[in-house]
């Protein structure tokens, strides 16, 4: 299992401090990663897609 911790401080009102911990559970034979997010504070003013953005950025760094 691989854990990746990232922090982002955005100056905008809609994206306060976000701490993400991504745990890579395993990689399937097709190359798709399965993961889970932990330690993500509620973001009532943020669109849900923001988490997908961070996941894609982090996973593409491999």
From Swiss-Prot:
Organism of provenance: Saccharomyces cerevisiae (strain ATCC 204508 / S288c)
Keyword Transcription: yes
Xref: InterPro entries: RRT15-like (IPR052997)
Functional summary from the UniProt entry: Involved in modulation of rDNA transcription.
Keywords: Transcription, Transcription regulation
Protein name: Regulator of rDNA transcription protein 15
Entry's family note: Belongs to the ART2/RRT15 family.
């Amino acid at each position: 299992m691989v854990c990746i911790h990232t922090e982002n401080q955005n100056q905008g009102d809609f994206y306060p401090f976000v701490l993400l911990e991504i745990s890579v559970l395993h990689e399937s034979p097709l190359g798709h990663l399965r993961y889970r997010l932990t330690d993500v504070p509620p973001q009532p003013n943020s669109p849900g897609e923001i988490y997908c953005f961070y996941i894609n950025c982090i996973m593409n760094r491999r």
